[in-house]
């Protein structure tokens, strides 16, 4: 089974629903494969990925398992990484031997912290696959759902990640087109995508837009204009410390724009649906991911650190026990054990309401 896999999606079971509907006229063997991580109940068991394909009724069908240590595809031409998948980094590492300079990876609506790690996931420049950021945009929906599974009106923006680390880039050039030998596999994998619906964006602009959306999302948790203004200023200071700040589009990063984005519209880059705004657990997971990104670039003297510390001392909120006065406690939000404790203790409360 593993030997015939050329194009596949790393994602949850439902990730291929839209793909299946668009390719229902094709023979089953020609439809894309869904690989999802299998939870292990024992550390002694060999990790495996569950293989799903589509039958004639477009219902996910479990057809096989792949043992990730002993069974792997020989070569993967095109790999789409859905933002809903878990264990993303470990899966990419395990499939690293199946990917080379002729392979293409499309990171669909992924967080900044994942593609920042791509250079360490694929350390050899000469064999590093082509890596693209894929950003879905809905045309008619007010909330951007997980596009690969349940959107009918969409547009896919692609931007190529530079082959050299971002801090060494002098300029982020525009990606004018997908390589001809890889574009067809991508469109075929995505089903009914037409060429007119695939745009090629300047990497600098796409990265800047994603960072802007990320900041706007975290600013939303604060209840008053004054707190949101302070949060916006603190995040702009974080951005100025990024080693690749020189290639960003500075027009995205103004306090006015961040505040406007956080108040008037949902974030466009993440797969954020209404459930995130009403589910405290989803909100906390997104906040954790953004802080994980920020903590790489700030120290205890920075405004964001001070702002979060002061805010949580004055706010009657579950976040107050997450953001402690020392940086080591900031890191605790990232640890699995600490997050599990928060889930148990606080997720029955409304963490979106911060009261001064």
UniProtKB/Swiss-Prot annotation:
GO molecular function: translation activator activity; translation regulator activity
Chief location of this protein within or outside the cell: mitochondrion
GO CC annotations on file: cytoplasm; mitochondrial inner membrane; mitochondrion
Chain ranges passing through the membrane: none
Cellular localisation: Mitochondrion
Record has Protein biosynthesis as a keyword: no
Gene Ontology BP, a term: mitochondrial translational initiation
Phenotypic consequence of gene deletion: Decreases mitochondrial respiratory chain complex III assembly. Decreases RNA level of cytochrome b cob1 and may lead to abnormal folding of cob1 protein. Abolishes growth on the non-fermentable carbon source galactose.
Keyword field contains Mitochondrion: yes
Keywords (A to Z) from UniProt: Mitochondrion, Translation regulation
Subunit relationships: Component of a complex, at least composed of cbp7 and cbp8.
Known function: Translation factor for cob1/cytochrome b; plays a role in cob1 mRNA stabilization and required for correct folding of the protein.
Designated name of the protein: Cytochrome b translation regulator cbp7
Organism this protein belongs to: Schizosaccharomyces pombe (strain 972 / ATCC 24843)
Gene name in the database record: cbp7
